[in-house]
From Swiss-Prot:
Annotated pathway: One-carbon metabolism; methylamine degradation; formaldehyde from methylamine: step 1/1
PTM (free text): Predicted to be exported by the Tat system. The position of the signal peptide cleavage has been experimentally proven. Tryptophan tryptophylquinone (TTQ) is formed by oxidation of the indole ring of a tryptophan to form tryptophylquinone followed by covalent cross-linking with another tryptophan residue.
Crosslinked residue numbers (Tryptophan tryptophylquinone (Trp-Trp)): W114-W165
Cofactor(s) demanded: tryptophan tryptophylquinone residue
Top-level class of the enzyme under EC nomenclature: oxidoreductase
Alphabetized UniProt keyword annotations: Disulfide bond, Electron transport, Oxidoreductase, Periplasm, Signal, Transport, TTQ
Cofactor note: Uses a protein-derived tryptophan tryptophylquinone (TTQ) cofactor.
Pfam families in UniProt: Me-amine-dh_L (PF02975)
This protein's name: Methylamine dehydrogenase light chain
Disulfide bonds: C80-C145, C86-C118, C93-C178, C95-C143, C103-C134, C135-C166
Entry's Gene Ontology molecular function annotations: aliphatic amine dehydrogenase activity; methylamine dehydrogenase (amicyanin) activity
Highest classification ranks of the organism: Bacteria, Pseudomonadati, Pseudomonadota, Alphaproteobacteria, Rhodobacterales
Name of the gene encoding the protein in the UniProt record: mauA
Modified residues (Tryptophylquinone): W114
Length: 188
């Protein structure tokens, strides 16, 4: 009981001293500034590209190519390991009546795309691929692929393959069907 009394006295003296030296408006203003600043911190841009090596600490040893596990081929365009499909997340349109560059008949091409740099083993060059979704029919279910080579999290949407990009398709065709992978140009 005696310990509580001393603590109460100490808190009372401290609070009276603070109240005597500061104004209420100033304290409330500072508190508001701190709270507003803390609320805005999540809105700051984040770029964690430098942390990828630390995130893959158990990955390949130094001097070993981290992309060595991805072995692209240039023969079967309907296979997930075809070189253009290095970052595709969805169904390959070539299996659904389309091609690498054209949507199947009856589907609509989404206006938005995500990009990746894919290595062609035949000519030893890397190419920029602009993946675009074909929309309007239900998911084909043929040739599903989940490749994440070069993918970045959703806060970098131009490099994220987890987003369904059908929101920009004609005629409100919002249902995902498959993905095409046209070449934009050589990656430098």
């Amino acid at each position: 009981m005696l310990g509580n009394f001393r603590f109460d006295d100490m808190v009372e003296k401290l609070s009276r001293r603070v109240a005597g030296r500061t104004s209420r408006r100033g304290a409330i203003g500072r508190l508001g500034t701190v709270l507003a600043g803390a609320a805005l911190v999540p809105l700051l841009p984040v770029d964690r590209r430098g942390r990828v090596s630390r995130a893959n600490a158990a990955g390949p040893a130094e001097g070993v190519d981290p992309r060595a596990k991805w072995q692209p081929q240039d023969n079967d365009i309907q296979a997930c390991d075809y070189w253009r499909h290095c970052s595709i997340d969805g169904n390959i349109c070539d299996c659904s009546g389309g091609s690498l560059t054209n949507c199947p008949p009856g589907t609509k091409l989404a206006t938005a795309s995500w990009v990746a740099s894919c290595y062609n083993p035949t000519d030893g060059q890397s190419y920029l691929i602009a993946y675009r979704d074909c929309c309007g029919y239900n998911v084909s279910g043929r040739c599903p692929c989940l490749n994440t080579e070069g993918e970045l999290p959703v806060y970098r949407p131009e490099f994220a393959n987890d987003i369904i990009w059908c929101f920009g398709a004609e005629d409100d065709a919002m249902t995902y069907h498959c993905t095409i992978s046209p070449i934009v140009g050589k990656a430098s």
